[in-house]
Regions:
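Non-catalytic accessory regions of SAM-dependent methyltransferases
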Residues: 1-121
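Non-catalytic substrate-recognition/targeting regions of SAM-dependent transferases
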Residues: 105-118, 134-209
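Conserved class I S-adenosyl-L-methionine
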Residues: 225-234
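Conserved SAM-binding loop of SAM-dependent methyltransferases across substrates and taxa
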Residues: 235-248
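Mobile active-site "lid"/loop adjacent to the S-adenosyl-L-methionine
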Residues: 298-327
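S-adenosyl-L-methionine
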Residues: 258-301
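C-terminal catalytic and target-recognition region of SAM-dependent MTase-like enzymes
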Residues: 296, 337-399
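Conserved SAM-binding motif I beta-strand of class I
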Residues: 249-254
Length: 399
């Protein structure tokens, strides 16, 4: 097997079980020229075995699969998937009567860097974020079938937009197990008893933003009798929770017509009336907020897409978060509540909080932090990989 030899002193992060080997840590490669996605072994400059993982050209040269000396075979994949499954059993998600959508594998958080698997009812949706995981998808599918048995009827690969295209992989989304009878239409799932249509074929990510489940439940608690504005609403997750929590009215805003069509279907699916309980606005969320009447909304949800996907975009992202949150804090009704989020991994909790602080100071209003929010337990953070805590949120009480 090909060996990756590290520069002197660069083994320390691996000895602390961090799962990434950066290109700058590599001294030389022995035993041949690895192809992208190959399993390679990693050694210290002194010859000490450190782990094995998937090789890839780029800033992260190796993503560690195991710190033990073992073969990455069908049994390895079964153990890995079964470990993730058992963790979701512990969380009460597997077999739940009121929640049928959850994350089964969360990359580094489940010790499988580069792999995401979400469960929607009887379908698993797989996303590979590395060449190695993409090339391992058939073995992963077999492991999923072994773990779930007859409860799993289909596996959909949605790696076309996430796997590294420069690796020359044959990327094409599609079913790798089960019939394509579902086509491109949406399938209904439950989340805390709320019904949602999920389209994993055409939707963003794997079809739904599962990482906001706990935060949506908190919105429900604050919504009774309130006029609610949900910005960047996608398919209306927060909107449905607000309605089910007894909101007087909910307005949802997103620039995607497809997303707004799905919002309206979800509203009807849950027994509410479009135009009565809920109103959809297909337009730019920031422009909508700029022109909306101040004091109209008791509760606002501000959940934009990632403003920064690499460190070079950090400063611009922080300015954008400040502008956006200043608008929300300025416009919300006195005594109102703002739920605000960032899903940008490169924007840490401190930077996000500083951007929101600057926004509040700009408005001159009195603002208190009621909650600090993060991702749910089925999006776990590997304690040795703190970068995995990407979702951060604040709940603000604005006087």
């Amino acid at each position: 097997m090909v060996r990756i030899i590290l520069n002197k002193g660069k083994e320390q992060s691996l000895k602390r079980f961090h799962p990434w080997v950066f290109s700058g840590a590599v001294k030389r490669i022995e035993g041949g020229d690895p192809a992208e996605g190959d399993v390679v072994e990693v050694y210290s400059s002194g010859g000490e075995y450190l782990g094995c993982g998937h090789y890839q050209i780029g800033s992260i040269t190796v993503r560690i699969l195991s710190f033990n000396k073992e073969t990455i075979d069908s049994d390895f994949w079964y153990r890995a998937i079964k470990g993730a499954y058992d963790a979701r059993c512990t969380l009460g998600l597997v077999g739940s009567d009121n929640t049928t959508a959850y994350r089964l594998v969360h990359g580094e958080g489940d010790f499988l860097p580069g792999l995401i698997i979400d469960i929607y009812g009887n379908t698993a949706v797989l996303q590979a974020h590395s060449a190695g995981m993409f090339l391992s998808k058939d073995a992963i599918a077999e492991a999923l079938k072994r773990v779930y048995g007859s409860a799993l009827e289909a596996i959909y690969d949605k790696s076309e937009g996430t796997a590294p295209f420069k690796a020359g992989l044959p990327l094409k989304d599609g079913y790798i197990y089960g019939k394509e009878g579902a086509g491109t239409d949406a399938q209904a799932v439950l989340e805390n008893g709320n019904k949602f249509l999920v389209n994993w074929v055409e939707g963003q990510k794997t079809g739904f933003f599962l990482d906001q489940r706990d935060n949506r439940a908190l919105v429900k608690k604050y919504s009774v009798g309130k006029n609610v504005l949900n910005l960047f609403c996608y398919t209306g997750g927060f909107s449905i929770y607000a309605l089910s929590g007894g909101a007087a009215h909910v307005d949802s805003v997103d620039s995607s017509r497809k997303a707004m069509d799905m919002v309206e279907r979800n509203v009807e699916l849950n027994g509410f009336k479009e135009g009565v309980d809920h109103t959809s606005y297909c337009e730019d969320a920031i422009e909508f907020m700029r022109k909306c009447e101040g004091g109209k909304y008791d509760l606002m949800i501000v959940d934009p897409p990632a403003f920064a996907k690499h460190r070079g975009a950090l400063d611009n992202a922080l300015r954008a978060y400040k502008r956006l949150n200043a608008l929300a804090i300025e416009k919300v009704k006195p005594g109102g509540v703002v739920f605000t989020y960032s899903c940008s991994q490169v924007v840490d909790k401190q930077n996000f909080a500083l951007a929101v602080f600057s926004a509040a100071a700009q408005t001159g209003r009195r603002v208190r932090i009621l909650h600090r929010l993060t991702q749910p337990a089925d999006h776990p953070v590997n304690i040795y990989h703190p970068e995995g805590e990407y979702l951060k949120g604040l709940v603000l009480l604005v006087e």
